[in-house]
UniProtKB/Swiss-Prot annotation:
This is Flap endonuclease 1-A. Binds 2 magnesium ions per subunit. They probably participate in the reaction catalyzed by the enzyme. May bind an additional third magnesium ion after substrate binding. The keyword Aminoacyl-tRNA synthetase does not apply. Structure-specific nuclease with 5'-flap endonuclease and 5'-3' exonuclease activities involved in DNA replication and repair. During DNA replication, cleaves the 5'-overhanging flap structure that is generated by displacement synthesis when DNA polymerase encounters the 5'-end of a downstream Okazaki fragment. It enters the flap from the 5'-end and then tracks to cleave the flap base, leaving a nick for ligation. Also involved in the long patch base excision repair (LP-BER) pathway, by cleaving within the apurinic/apyrimidinic (AP) site-terminated flap. Residues 368-380 have a biased composition (Basic residues). One of its GO terms (molecular function) is DNA binding. It is found in: Nucleus, Nucleolus; Nucleus, Nucleoplasm; Mitochondrion. Residues 336-344 are annotated as: Interaction with PCNA. Interacts with PCNA. Three molecules of FEN1 bind to one PCNA trimer with each molecule binding to one PCNA monomer. PCNA stimulates the nuclease activity without altering cleavage specificity. Mg(2+) 2 binds at D180, D182, D234. It comes from Oryza sativa subsp. indica. CDD domains: H3TH_FEN1-Euk, PIN_FEN1. Residues 1-105 are annotated as: N-domain. Its main location: nucleus.
Length: 380
């Protein structure tokens, strides 16, 4: 789920913290990618028609491999250096959210069965997507594919979004790419949406800067974390009746969840029983991450390994895979130039921030202070 309604909240209240960027703007940049979110998108979109998906001869789904292969090649061709980060064990506080997701998939499965019996194509399309789940096998197959492509893989001890943010905070990558906004709450200095969009539409990349988010919202990082918890996150329920705009107003007025709880109208707003907001806050401020990872390297592709895995084991077209390998090799040579050309021909965003209402209040700048395990990182 991520942070409920955060994109719209920022568009309405912190437009200067958001800017559209071209794909090519990130030439030579290391980008940490939330792998599970990308795989989920590929399973939903790539090669899907109703209940039909891409499969190999054994009937195993290959949409995630097709999507990961093609999208990663596009990143490499643009000179981007992706680092895919995979989820580890979820925190205990997330079990309730995972149980909700399981229940929703069960309901969708029942609805899908009825839609199939009725021959309702639109309903089949809708409910089949809601039954999608990223499995351990999907993750392991994508890790194998990426390593064969010469692309670095990081296995997070816990949440991938937190690990991505830690890599960015410690200058091991330039930005974090995902569709869920959690990485901003974990303090990632730069966050990118739509970089991994698998649709055929050319959607511009949306870049967020956490420092500008805080400045525009006139909040400290601690207050921003409380805002995200109030808006709705994966770690606990939110207060019924309080959405993003109300949460922002309350945080600006009272400064913290504790102060809000002391002053809120409890007849109007129902506080969740045994609400673990303090533990949720701790998970955002002190996530379980590691920087003790192998040096990030983008190696030459294992051509024989890719043919074996994609063509022989998963039924991919031999000619297409061979041509794709050539693209990877060419892209690697191109990216070895680094960002030297930026000294002569910088890529500048042509977007104009959305307008917002004038405010007479003086914004307060704040800097995220995150705790991570391990030592410092490499230059991004």
């Amino acid at each position: 789920m991520g942070i409920k309604g955060l994109t719209k909240l920022l568009a309405d209240n912190a437009p200067k913290a958001m800017k559209e960027q071209k794909f090519e703007s990130y030439f030579g940049r290391r980008i940490a990618v939330d792998a599970s979110m990308s795989i989920y998108q590929f399973l939903i979109v790539v090669g899907r028609t109703g209940m039909e998906t891409l499969t190999n001869e054994a009937g195993e789904v290959t949409s995630h491999l097709q999507g990961m292969f093609n999208r990663t090649i596009r990143l490499l061709e643009a000179g981007i250096k992706p680092v895919y980060v995979f989820d580890g064990k979820p925190p205990d506080l997330k079990k309730q959210e995972l149980a909700k997701r399981y229940s929703k998939r069960e309901d969708a499965t029942k609805e899908l069965t009825e839609a199939v019996e009725e021959g309702d194509k639109d309903a089949i399309e809708k409910f089949s997507k809601r039954t999608v789940k990223v499995t351990k096998q999907h993750n392991e197959e994508c890790k194998r594919l990426l390593r064969l492509m010469g692309v670095p893989v990081v296995e997070a001890p816990c949440e991938a979004e937190a690990e991505c943010a830690a890599l960015c905070i410690n200058d091991m990558v330039y930005a974090v790419a995902s569709e869920d906004m959690d990485s901003l709450t974990f303090g990632a200095p730069r966050f990118l949406r739509h970089l991994m969009d698998p649709s055929s539409k050319k959607i511009p990349v949306m870049e967020f800067e956490v420092a500008k988010v805080l400045e525009e919202l006139e909040l400290t990082m601690d207050q921003f974390i409380d805002l995200c918890i109030l808006s709705g996150c994966d770690y606990c329920d939110s207060i019924k009746g309080i959405g993003g705009q109300t949460a922002l107003k309350l945080i600006r007025q009272h400064g913290s969840i504790e102060s809000i709880l002391e002053n809120i109208n409890k007849d109007r707003y129902q506080i969740p029983e045994d609400w673990p907001y303090q533990e949720a806050r701790r998970l955002f401020k002190e996530p379980n991450v590691t920087l003790d990872i192998p040096e990030l390297k983008w190696n030459a592709p294992d051509e024989e390994g890719l043919v074996q895995f994609l063509v022989k084991e998963n039924g991919f077209n031999q000619d297409r895979v061979t041509k794709a390998i050539e693209k990877i090799k060419f892209a690697k040579n191109k990216s070895s130039q680094g960002r030297l050309e930026s000294f002569f021909k910088p890529v500048v965003s042509t977007s104009v921030p959305l307008k917002r209402k004038d405010t007479s209040e003086k914004p307060t700048k704040a800097v995220a202070n995150k705790k991570t395990k391990g030592a410092g990182g490499k230059k991004k």
